């Protein structure tokens, strides 16, 4: 049965995907940057369900990124850039052991390996450059040569830079296909893209595809921003796919997720994406995803965890289901952090914490040394970070043994603590963490959940939990209805336990006054919808039919009623909330969207659905 695409195969921070097939098995890895141990290898048999296998680079090598994972003859390789040069590791078994990194002593980023028809090996890097490799692939021969200039996209496109990078190569029907990224990895929502070129020779000359860009975000209203860094993969049935990364709209904080789309080959020998395809049937069922919750049974750290800018397994001790982590530094900026990747727009995480004398520990959301938020304690006071530069203090009346809980709901963070994990005290709420991402702090990282230990001695962590916090239907307790009244043109709400008998909220007065949100100082026809992310979406007509009577307008309608008819408004009010209290608003004017809508008669009674 055909399914529609694109689809997310790994939500959260899984950027720069590199994918390969070995018979019926598919393997994939991503950029680890400063997270160590690095290069988490994933395994699948249907391209949709992935299980984590191992981490292959335990030692810390600096910011490693944009790898190329492949198998040549009987050996697996990972080529990657770090510390101003390119490296390679190899293994006979995908699960290891893997070799120590070998310095290729060649600059550039985003390496892409290819073998020509004579068996010669080459390595492409960014800027359209290529260099010959030795037969074993562990050294280079000669100098880099520029062989490709990229694809000239329209000048008016809003991008970050030309940034020709991510060269990945495949051979198909007598051609070599060079798949590259352009436009910049972050920056504007429309920055990134995937482009294609082909050649009869592995070193060019390259002819650009008439279907470029293959993948691109065309508008900031698209569901996925900065789509790019694509790699082609064929499945066991001979179908082809493209895997790439992208930011979820409005969620740079989550990092770049890994997505997949099917492609088709045209009669003239090019490829392009299609919206539907039949997925692969696996030989064995694979449980998808990485379990983030942890009871710290030991004796080794789970695959969900990484250190930041170090690899310090000797700092960890497992004892009686408690992870003891040796402290260092004084604050989250220089302390020891253990991080895991958040996957959801709305999630909750908690952990039981024990601090020692002179020790500070906590639960935080961590981007880098200059961007983090959460709660830490020395047993005497709680320190709540809204960001690295904004810290408040509250008395700790619980002591050195406490529970901490963070709820990140649409980039709005609440912080709670508890003595027993049952009754919670809110220390802070509605803290905005939406700015803690690459476009403000650089680095291409993500806002990850972190365990933090600083000062002296060790901090103890147990019963770590992470869960998607979108409410389940069985946890809901009432029906909500929204409506308007002609006498006040405001938004009213009512609730019901059974869906039949409703009680008005706010003593029957408007919950939101129309003159505070609408251009015409009144709203009508409200519709509310709860999205799959758990947020509430409101849509309303921007219209006050008695605006002249109530002194908001000198005329009966905004325009001549004889020519444009009753009401003749051209606006809607769109709002979003996670808690029905704090709302974001957009005032939509159709005549401002397009000249085609400038003479629209009346826009009213909208309905939102997903």
Language-model regions: role of each:
Residues 1-21, 34, 47-71, 97-115, ...:
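Surface loop/turn signatures of beta-propeller and other carbohydrate-active proteins
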Residues 25-27, 75-78, 119-122, 175-178, ...:
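Entry beta-strands of beta-propeller and related beta-repeat scaffolds
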Residues 33-36, 85, 129-131, 183-187, ...:
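Short glycine/acidic-enriched loop and turn motifs that connect beta-strands
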Residues 43-44, 88-93, 193-202, 258-266, ...:
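Beta-propeller blade signature
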Residues 164-207, 213-215:
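Loop/turn-rich, solvent-exposed surfaces of beta-rich toroidal or solenoidal domains
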Residues 181-189, 246-255, 541-569:
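Short, conserved, GDST-rich strand-edge loop motifs in beta-rich repeat architectures
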Residues 240-246, 251-266, 270-274:
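Blade-level signature of beta-propeller repeat domains, shared across WD40, Kelch, NHL, RCC1
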Residues 249, 267-476:
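Extracellular glycan-recognition regions
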């Amino acid at each position: 049965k055909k399914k529609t695409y694109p689809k997310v195969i790994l939500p959260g921070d899984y950027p720069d995907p590199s994918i390969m097939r070995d018979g019926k098995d598919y393997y994939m890895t991503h950029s680890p940057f400063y997270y160590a141990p690095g290069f988490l290898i994933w395994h699948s048999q249907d391209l949709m369900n992935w299980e984590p296998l191992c981490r292959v680079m335990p030692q810390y090598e600096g910011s490693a990124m944009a790898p190329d994972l492949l198998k040549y003859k009987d050996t697996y390789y990972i080529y990657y850039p770090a510390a101003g040069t390119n490296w390679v590791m190899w293994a006979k078994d995908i699960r290891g052991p893997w070799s120590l990194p070998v310095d290729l002593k060649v600059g550039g980023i985003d390496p892409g390996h290819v073998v020509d028809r004579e068996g010669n090996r080459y390595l492409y890097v960014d800027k359209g450059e290529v260099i010959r490799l030795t037969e074993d692939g562990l050294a280079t021969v000669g100098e880099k040569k520029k062989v490709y200039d990229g694809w000239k996209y329209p000048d008016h496109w809003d991008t970050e830079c030309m940034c020709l990078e991510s060269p990945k190569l495949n051979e198909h029907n007598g051609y070599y296909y060079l798949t590259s990224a352009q436009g910049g990895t972050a920056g504007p929502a429309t920055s990134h893209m995937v482009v294609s070129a082909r050649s009869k020779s592995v070193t060019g000359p390259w002819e650009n595809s008439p279907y470029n860009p293959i993948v691109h975000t065309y508008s900031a209203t698209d569901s996925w921003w900065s789509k790019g860094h694509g790699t082609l993969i064929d499945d066991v049935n001979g179908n082809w796919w493209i895997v790439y990364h992208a930011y979820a709209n409005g969620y740079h904080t989550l990092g770049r997720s890994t997505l997949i789309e099917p492609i088709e080959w045209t009669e003239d020998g090019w490829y392009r994406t299609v919206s539907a395809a039949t997925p692969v049937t696996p030989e064995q069922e694979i449980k998808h995803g990485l379990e983030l919750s942890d009871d710290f049974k030991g004796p080794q750290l789970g695959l969900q965890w990484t250190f930041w800018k170090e690899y310090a397994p000797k700092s960890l001790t497992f004892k009686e289901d408690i992870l003891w982590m040796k402290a260092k530094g004084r604050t989250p900026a220089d302390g020891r952090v253990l991080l895991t990747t958040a996957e959801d727009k709305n999630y909750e995480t908690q952990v039981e914490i024990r601090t020692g004398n002179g020790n500070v520990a906590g639960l935080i959301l961590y981007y880098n040394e200059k961007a983090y938020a959460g709660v830490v304690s020395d047993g005497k006071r709680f320190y709540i970070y809204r960001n690295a530069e904004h810290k408040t203090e509250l008395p700790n009346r619980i002591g050195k043994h406490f529970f901490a809980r963070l709820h990140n709901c649409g980039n709005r963070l609440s912080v709670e603590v508890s003595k027993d994990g049952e009754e919670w005290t809110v220390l802070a709420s509605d803290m905005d963490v939406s700015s803690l991402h690459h476009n403000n702090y650089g680095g291409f990282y993500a806002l990850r959940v972190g365990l933090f230990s600083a000062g002296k001695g060790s901090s103890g962590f147990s019963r770590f939990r992470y869960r998607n916090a979108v409410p389940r239907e069985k946890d809901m307790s009432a029906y909500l209805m929204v409506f308007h009244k002609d006498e006040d043109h405001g938004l009213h709400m009512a609730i019901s336990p059974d869906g039949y008998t409703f009680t008005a909220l706010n003593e029957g007065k408007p919950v939101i006054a129309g003159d505070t949100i609408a251009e015409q100082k009144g709203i009508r026809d409200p519709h509310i919808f709860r999205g799959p992310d758990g947020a509430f979406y409101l849509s309303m007509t921007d219209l006050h039919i008695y605006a002249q009577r109530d002194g908001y307008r000198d005329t009966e309608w905004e325009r001549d009623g004889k020519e444009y008819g009753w009401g003749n408004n051209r606006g809607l009010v769109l709002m979003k909330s996670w808690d029905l209290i704090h709302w974001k608003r957009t005032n939509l004017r159709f005549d401002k969207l397009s000249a085609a809508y400038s003479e629209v008669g009346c826009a009213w009674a909208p309905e939102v659905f997903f």
